[in-house]
C-alpha cells in the first residue's frame, strides 16, 4: 500500500508492505536528505509483519519544504504524524545514520510505544562523528569520492544507490548537517544525546560495517550508554550493510525481532 500524508509543511510519501500479525517494522532513512530507496530490501521481512518505509519531507517522493523549515523538530513531528495516520501504536523502530539520530530522539520521547530499537550505522554525538570522519578522511589519499567509495558504499554498481542519489535533496543535508561529514554547520551542530542514553530501557541492537563511518569509538558510545544494547558488525561492509551484506543483515534483524517478541 502506497499513500501520502498531507500536512501544512508538505506531503509525505509512504509505503506499507505486508500484513503479518507481528509488530510492524518502521524504518527511518538517513541523510539528512536521502530517500527510502536503499532501505527497500528490508521489505523482504514483510512476509511476517508490515514494513513501513517513507521519504522524509523534502526528499524523494515527498514534497520539498522551504529551506528555512529544517530542524530536528520538523522530522520528529512528521514521524509522529505518520504513526498517527497509519495507526502504528506499537512498532519496532529501525534508523540508519541520520535516521538513527531521529530514532534516538523519538525513542527518548515515546519509548513506551516501541517494542525495540535498531540503530544502524549511527551515532549519539555529532561532534564525535565529525571528528571520526575527519580522521578517516585524512587516512584516505585522493578525492572525496575515493573516501566515499571506502566508507559509504564499496560497490558503485547498485540500482538502489543510484536512485537514492538521483532523488535525494542536498539542500536538506547542507541545512541540517553541512558541506561534508567532517564539517558541521547546520541545525545538528551541537547535537548530543549521550547523557540521555541510559533512559532507554528497551531492547536495542547496534549495527555497523567494519569499514563504516560509524567507527568502533562511535559504536562504543551507544553500547556503553544504552543499558540493553548489543552489537553486530558486518565485516565486508561500510556505511550501508543492508546493501553490502543483505542476506546477513536481514537475517540479523529478523533474529533480533524474534528474540524480542519471544520475551
Segments predicted by a language model, with ranges:
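N-terminal cap/lid segment of alpha/beta-hydrolase-fold proteins
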Residues: 1-11
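Catalytic active-site module of serine/aspartate enzymes centered on a nucleophile-bearing elbow/loop
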Residues: 229-263
Amino acid at each position: 500500500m502506497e499513500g501520502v500524508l498531507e500536512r501544512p509543511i508538505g506531503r509525505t510519501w509512504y509505503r506499507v508492505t505486508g500484513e503479518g500479525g507481528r509488530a510492524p517494522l518502521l524504518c527511518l532513512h538517513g541523510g539528512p536528505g536521502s530517500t527510502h530507496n536503499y532501505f527497500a530490501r528490508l521489505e523482504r521481512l514483510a512476509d511476517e509483519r508490515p514494513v513501513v518505509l517513507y521519504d522524509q519531507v523534502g526528499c524523494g517522493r515527498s514534497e520539498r519544504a522551504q529551506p528555512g523549515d529544517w530542524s530536528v523538530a520538523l522530522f520528529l513531528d512528521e514521524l509522529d504524524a505518520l504513526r498517527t495516520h497509519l495507526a502504528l501504536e506499537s512498532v519496532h523502530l529501525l534508523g540508519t545514520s541520520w535516521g538513527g539520530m531521529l530514532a534516538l530522539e523519538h525513542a527518548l520521547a515515546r519509548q513506551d510505544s516501541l517494542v525495540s530499537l535498531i540503530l544502524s550505522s549511527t551515532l549519539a554525538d555529532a561532534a564525535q562523528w565529525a571528528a571520526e570522519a575527519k580522521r578517516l578522511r585524512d587516512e584516505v589519499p585522493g578525492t572525496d569520492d575515493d573516501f566515499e567509495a571506502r566508507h559509504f558504499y564499496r560497490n558503485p554498481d547498485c540500482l538502489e544507490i543510484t536512485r537514492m542519489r538521483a532523488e535525494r535533496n542536498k539542500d536538506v543535508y547542507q541545512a541540517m548537517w553541512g558541506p561534508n561529514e567532517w564539517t558541521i554547520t547546520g541545525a545538528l551542530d551541537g547535537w548530543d544525546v549521550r547523557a540521555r542514553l541510559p533512559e532507554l530501557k528497551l531492547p536495542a541492537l547496534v549495527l555497523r560495517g567494519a569499514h563504516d563511518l560509524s567507527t568502533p569509538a562511535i559504536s562504543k558510545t551507544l553500547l556503553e550508554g544504552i543499558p540493553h544494547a548489543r552489537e553486530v558488525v558486518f565485516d565486508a561492509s561500510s556505511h550501508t550493510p543492508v546493501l553490502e551484506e543483505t542476506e546477513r543483515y536481514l537475517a540479523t534483524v529478523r533474529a533480533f525481532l524474534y528474540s524480542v517478541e519471544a520475551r
